[in-house]
């Protein structure tokens, strides 16, 4: 059942980290830059840090050497820290956009961020990835201007051999492990769906066949 929870969510998180320039063995290479390395550790923000995609993103970011800040509820803060976050922020109590915080990369795993405000959270050359729909290229140009030159990218999963091998490596070395909120038999699939629609759960929901 743990393996069943990996494909879409973990691949989405992996793709987001890579598109934002956070890769194995790198420091700050935000926005996909591959030039001279900055010796500073990459600062990454993950929203929805204990959700289905976000909890994978925290672990991948940590495995790649980034300093991950995660948004979550106070009830889930301990879990986020155990997953590898260096810091948690209560998304209901703190207005990130007016906080003055800056990150090399922002991954909106929750999918609720206002795109036109994201530039306030990004350092120059920073990158923003989201699980939401990202505009096509001709519209993305306009959005990039709104972001003041910061990069905007979709975190949609891709299914390539190299990505599957990387997930296998991360799991084998113990750097990536799914959190299972609940497991339902097929005859209770409607209960699983209701839980998913309510939100607020941690990690993944499994339906066994």
Segments predicted by a language model, with ranges:
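Terminal helix/beta-alpha structural elements that buttress the NAD(P)+-binding lobe
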Residues: 1-209
């Amino acid at each position: 059942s743990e393996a069943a929870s990996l494909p879409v969510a973990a691949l989405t998180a992996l793709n987001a980290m890579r598109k934002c320039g956070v890769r194995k063995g790198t420091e700050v290479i935000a926005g996909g830059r591959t030039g001279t390395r900055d010796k500073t550790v990459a600062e990454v923000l993950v929203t929805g840090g204990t959700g289905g995609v976000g909890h994978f993103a925290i672990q991948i970011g940590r495995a790649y050497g980034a300093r991950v800040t995660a948004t979550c509820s106070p009830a889930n803060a301990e879990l986020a820290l155990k997953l590898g976050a260096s810091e948690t922020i209560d998304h209901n109590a703190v207005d990130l956009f007016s906080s003055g915080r800056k990150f090399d990369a922002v991954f909106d795993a929750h999918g609720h961020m206002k795109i036109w405000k994201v530039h306030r959270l990004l350092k120059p050359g920073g990158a923003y990835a989201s699980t939401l729909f990202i505009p096509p290229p001709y519209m993305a140009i306009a959005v990039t201007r709104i972001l003041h030159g910061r990069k905007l990218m979709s975190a949609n999963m891709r299914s390539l051999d190299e990505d599957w091998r990387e997930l296998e490596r991360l799991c084998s070395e113990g750097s990536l492990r799914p959190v299972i909120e609940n497991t339902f038999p097929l005859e209770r699939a409607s209960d699983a769906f209701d839980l998913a629609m309510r939100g607020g759960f941690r990690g993944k929901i499994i339906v066994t066949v």
